[in-house]
From Swiss-Prot:
Gene name linked to the record: aroQ
UniProt pathway: Metabolic intermediate biosynthesis; chorismate biosynthesis; chorismate from D-erythrose 4-phosphate and phosphoenolpyruvate: step 3/7
Binding site for substrate: 76, 82, 89, 103-104, 113
Stated name of the protein: 3-dehydroquinate dehydratase
Quaternary organization: Homododecamer.
């Protein structure tokens, strides 16, 4: 039976493709979700992609991941990255291998974006690769889970 991973996207990521395309590019959230599904399938994994503008909903999905025995998480917490101790605590609490991803290079932007509460709860962080960061995140997560590329 294929292992499931969750790909969680936080606030404003529903606006990908139209919000500040000079920073985030023109790819849409639908493009991200398609890329994630295809990449995961290449490792025999199932990617369940979700997006919410609400912190509590993201936390509920993280908790649900534990109860459903989800193998791993990829999370782009958007602006909550820099503010949410609650998301950090949820990730630490469920003890599921997690990769943090950001479309833009947060370290080349405003100072307030340079701190991540998510990073300390993740085994890896990626930023600045555009939506390809999701492919890289799933590839790294698959390696962590011992999943091999399928033919």
């Amino acid at each position: 039976m294929a292992q499931t991973i969750y790909v969680l996207n936080g606030p404003n990521l529903n606006l990908l493709g139209t919000r500040e395309p000079e920073i985030y590019g023109r790819a849409t959230l639908a493009d991200v979700e398609k890329l994630c599904a295809e990449t995961a399938a290449g490792f025999g994994l199932i990617a369940v992609c979700r997006q919410s503008n609400h912190e509590g909903q993201l936390i509920d999905w993280i908790h649900q991941a534990r109860s459903e025995k989800v193998a791993g998480l990829v999370i782009n917490a958007g602006g909550y990255t820099h503010t949410s101790i609650a998301l950090h605590d949820a990730l630490v609490g469920v003890q599921i291998p997690t990769v943090e991803v950001h479309v833009s290079n947060v370290f080349a932007r405003e100072d307030f974006r340079h701190h991540s509460f998510i990073a300390k709860a993740a085994f890896a962080s990626l930023c600045g690769f555009g939506i390809d960061g999701y492919r890289l995140a799933i590839t790294g997560l698959a390696a962590k889970l011992g999943a091999s590329a399928t033919a």
